[in-house]
């Protein structure tokens, strides 16, 4: 499935929540879905609600349907609550961890930086953004990449790093401390509805 490259604000309006890392919230000006009939939003069916929750999670993490479905199948095989397992798998993706550590200003940018080989994983060059990391894994910005404008800007703008990660921005390195719990994940989705969508 092709990756979405259209207006992020339009998609945020469709979801009804801020999913992208845009500085301006498109919902403040137009708090209704895009399109001719956006203001006349009809009541959603239960199927529609579950579908939208799945789409919101996909859009939030910037993954294709195929990748998300594969993560769901892995999540239901793991012990514990399937919905929480799914969100953990999304959070532990290499591109998301790079973004969460503050080495990129958005997930799409983090994905591009990873693909172009600007990071080391445990001391080795790594360019697979979908790779699932684990506690103890160390991410380092390659020496020759540390002066790149996107990375410099991201490091200057970083506000806070989640408690399940640590990041040393002076030395351009970070580590996964532990697997995130649900209350350490700020994804604006109801994960149980996603599980219900796929298991229908």
From Swiss-Prot:
SUPFAM superfamilies: Alpha-L RNA-binding motif. Residues 92-158 form the S4 RNA-binding domain. GO terms for biological process: ribosomal small subunit biogenesis; translation. It holds the Pfam family S4. This is Small ribosomal subunit protein uS4. Belongs to the universal ribosomal protein uS4 family. The lineage of its organism: Bacteria, Bacillati, Actinomycetota, Rubrobacteria, Rubrobacterales. Coiled coil: none annotated. InterPro entries: Ribosomal_uS4, Ribosomal_uS4_bac-type, Ribosomal_uS4_N, S4_RNA-bd, S4_RNA-bd_sf. GO terms for cellular component: small ribosomal subunit. One of the primary rRNA binding proteins, it binds directly to 16S rRNA where it nucleates assembly of the body of the 30S subunit. Residues 1-43 are annotated as: Disordered. Part of the 30S ribosomal subunit. Contacts protein S5. The interaction surface between S4 and S5 is involved in control of translational fidelity. GO terms for molecular function: rRNA binding; structural constituent of ribosome. Residues 25-43 have a biased composition (Basic and acidic residues). Keywords: Ribonucleoprotein, Ribosomal protein, RNA-binding, rRNA-binding.
């Amino acid at each position: 499935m092709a990756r979405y490259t259209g207006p992020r604000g339009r998609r945020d309006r469709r979801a009804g929540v801020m999913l992208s890392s845009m500085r301006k919230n498109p919902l403040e000006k137009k708090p209704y879905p895009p399109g001719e009939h956006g203001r006349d939003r009809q009541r959603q069916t239960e199927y529609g609600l579950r579908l939208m929750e799945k789409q919101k999670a996909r859009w939030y993490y910037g993954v294709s349907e195929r990748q998300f479905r594969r993560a769901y199948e892995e999540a239901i095989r793991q012990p514990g609550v399937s919905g929480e397992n799914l969100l953990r798998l999304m959070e532990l993706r290499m591109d998301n961890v790079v973004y969460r550590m503050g080495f990129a200003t958005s997930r799409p940018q983090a994905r591009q930086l990873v693909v172009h080989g600007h990071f080391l994983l445990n001391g080795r060059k790594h360019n697979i953004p979908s790779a699932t990391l684990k506690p103890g894994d160390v991410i380092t910005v390659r020496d020759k990449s540390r002066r790149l404008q996107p990375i410099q800007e991201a490091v200057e703008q970083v506000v806070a790093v989640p408690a399940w990660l640590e990041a040393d921005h002076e030395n351009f390195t970070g580590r996964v401390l532990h697997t995130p719990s649900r209350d350490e994940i700020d994804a604006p989705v109801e994960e149980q509805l996603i599980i219900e969508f796929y298991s229908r």
